[in-house]
Each structure stands twice: as C-alpha cells, then as structure tokens.
Amino acid sequence: MADQKIRIRLKAFDHRLIDRSASEIVETAKRTGAQVRGPIPLPTKIERYTILVSPHADKDARDQYETRTHKRVLDIVDPNDKTVDALMKLELAAGVDVQIKLT
C-alpha cells in the first residue's frame, strides 16, 4: 500500500465524544506503525433555530435553540495491512459519524 493515504472525517454533536474517538483512532494507527497527521479541527457548524413560544400574537416571546456540529480530519500516511485491519475492528461511539476515503 505504498503512496496511499487514508483520510478519516469525523462528525459529532459532542466535542468530547469526537476527541475521544479521534484519540482512539490515532492510538490504533500508531500502534500498527503508521504515520498519523491530525486530528485537525475543522470549523464548527452552528445552526440556530428561533421558535415562537406564543401560539397567537406575541412576537416578542421566542425561544432560541442551536445545534453545533464538530468536525475533525485525520490523515494516515502509508498504511499497511495491519493498520487497515485494526481500523476496521475499531469500535467507536455511536454518536460519531465516520467517513473513510482511501486515496
């Protein structure tokens, strides 16, 4: 697998969960002898929602909610077969979305 790179993108609503998952991936990759770049934090996407509290006339009574989507990128340079097998067997938290791209 010479001159190949695995790019892993992580997304989660909880920053502690995504940092814990990223450290597990880095630890697993380094244990198998691969070189790791990252985790690189990407900008947090903040979505805000404003909802009218009153069912009828009061436009002044509103509640505001927001969701924050945290993102991280990891690059694993020159992975070997042991690295790929270890990453496939790795169990991450349920709240983390993982996208893996092999280039």
Curated annotation (Swiss-Prot):
The keyword Ribonucleoprotein applies. One of its GO terms (cellular component) is ribonucleoprotein complex. This is Small ribosomal subunit protein uS10. Part of the 30S ribosomal subunit. It comes from Xanthomonas campestris pv. campestris (strain B100). GO terms for biological process: translation. It holds the Pfam family Ribosomal_S10. One of its GO terms (molecular function) is structural constituent of ribosome. Keywords: Ribonucleoprotein, Ribosomal protein. Involved in the binding of tRNA to the ribosomes. Belongs to the universal ribosomal protein uS10 family. Gene3D superfamilies: Ribosomal protein S10 domain. The lineage of its organism: Bacteria, Pseudomonadati, Pseudomonadota, Gammaproteobacteria, Lysobacterales. HAMAP family: Ribosomal_uS10. InterPro entries: Ribosomal_uS10, Ribosomal_uS10_CS, Ribosomal_uS10_dom, Ribosomal_uS10_dom_sf.
